[in-house]
Amino acid sequence: MTKVVLLFIVLIVAIQAKKKLSADEIKQINQDCLKSSGMDSSVIKNIVSYDTFPKASDKYTKYLECMYVNQGYLDKDGLISYETIEDFILDFYDLDTVKLAIEPCVVHQDGKSGGERAYNTAKCLIKNLEKLEKQHEKEHKDITGKLA
């Protein structure tokens, strides 16, 4: 779960669009999105500290929409760019895992706004990655148990 939550945080604050941004630019975007959404920065910090995924709220979905737009994960029409997200997640997982995690989410562009779609996508990806990690851990445990 920690790896998945950390990935989510990086997905929020790291830029993996066509243009790489500097750490200062990323910090500025994060600050701008926090300010424009009215989001409390402690909520973002708690995601890492407590392994929790925040509940949807107007402020949080506005924050996510701002971050996703600036990262290239959300296009100007408010639709999720799964290709861009996939490129980013490939830095952390193998291609098969990424495809299995993203595939169930792609068919859904659920939400009335880009922010709701960003939230629903993040939630879907985290759920799928957690499931795949648990499955992988179980398979690894089964294999190592048979070898002992």
Q: Where is each model-derived feature located?
A:
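Mature extracellular/luminal domains of secreted and GPI-anchored eukaryotic proteins, especially small
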Residues: 13-148
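Cleavable N-terminal signal peptides of Sec/SRP-targeted secreted and luminal proteins
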Residues: 2-17
